[in-house]
């Protein structure tokens, strides 16, 4: 075997590939974009809330909307009889109810007006009044009349109350109005709302055949208006 020859010069072997370049990576770049978008979204929402709040304040300062006012100024109860065992309630009740629009710039469209009569929590009559438009600073007088008969079943406690009030000649009757109203400001008409009006403190004396009453009652009675 021939002896190995020492290397007298440089060794030229296969070329060694250069090291791969290190990738450039910005830590948190994707997260930073998400935070920026979220921050921008929050700023836009806050700006919209502030703009709407300022617009609502300006609108209120200019228009100064006020609640509609309902009062019962007169009532005539000429019949209120409940018979058994058929449980028929016969009634005749007429009311005078002025409705006041105190607003200077807002008109009101009463698209639907329902009046409900209750005794001891039992509804015994419902009527629908004629729709109308009410202008600025205007009073419109409603005259709902409940007349007829209906099946009304009272429990023992309600029957005792009815008997006691029959003896006294004064009946505690509730009138509730359910409305559909639109507001008009200039040429603009706003969406329909459904306010509720409750006239709960009506202690009405039964009128006698000669037109007198068994006891007196105090008018006007203010009704509760709730949007």
UniProtKB/Swiss-Prot annotation:
Induction, as annotated: By ethylene, abscisic acid (ABA), beta-aminobutyric acid (BABA), spermine, dark and infection with the cucumber mosaic virus (CMV). Induced by infection with the fungal pathogen Botrytis cinerea.
Coiled-coil region: none
Glycan-modified residues: 138, 210
Domain of life: Eukaryota
Primary location recorded for the protein, binned into one broad class: membrane
Keyword list, A-Z: Cell membrane, Glycoprotein, Membrane, Plant defense, Transmembrane, Transmembrane helix
Segments traversing the membrane: 42-62
Gene Ontology terms: biological process: defense response to virus; leaf senescence; response to other organism
The keyword Cell membrane is annotated on this UniProt entry: yes
Disulphides: none
Function recorded in the entry: May play a role in plant immunity.
The protein, known as: NDR1/HIN1-like protein 10
Species whose genome carries this gene: Arabidopsis thaliana (Mouse-ear cress)
Lineage of the species this protein comes from: Eukaryota, Viridiplantae, Streptophyta, Embryophyta, Tracheophyta
Name of the gene this protein is made from: NHL10
């Amino acid at each position: 075997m021939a002896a190995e020859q020492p290397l007298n010069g440089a060794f030229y072997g296969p070329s060694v590939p250069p090291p791969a370049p290190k990738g450039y990576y910005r830590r948190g770049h994707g997260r930073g974009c998400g935070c920026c978008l979220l921050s921008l979204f929050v700023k836009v929402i806050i700006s919209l809330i502030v703009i709407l709040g300022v617009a609502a304040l300006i609108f209120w300062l200019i228009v100064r909307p006020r609640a509609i006012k309902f009062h019962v100024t007169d009532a005539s109860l000429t019949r209120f009889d409940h018979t058994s065992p058929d449980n028929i309630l016969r009634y005749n009740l007429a009311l005078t109810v002025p409705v006041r629009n105190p607003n200077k710039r807002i008109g009101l469209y009463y698209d639907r007006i329902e009046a409900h009569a209750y005794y001891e929590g039992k509804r015994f009559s419902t009527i629908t009044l004629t729709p109308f438009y009410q202008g600025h600073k205007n009073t419109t007088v409603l005259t709902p009349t409940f007349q007829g008969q209906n099946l009304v079943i009272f429990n023992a406690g309600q029957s005792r109350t009815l008997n006691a009030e029959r003896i006294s000649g004064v009946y505690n009757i509730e009138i509730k109005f359910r409305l559909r109203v639109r507001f008009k400001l200039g040429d603009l008409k706003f969406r329909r709302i459904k306010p509720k009006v409750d006239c709960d403190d009506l202690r009405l004396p039964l009128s006698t055949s000669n037109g007198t009453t068994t006891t007196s009652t105090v008018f006007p009675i203010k009704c509760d208006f709730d949007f």
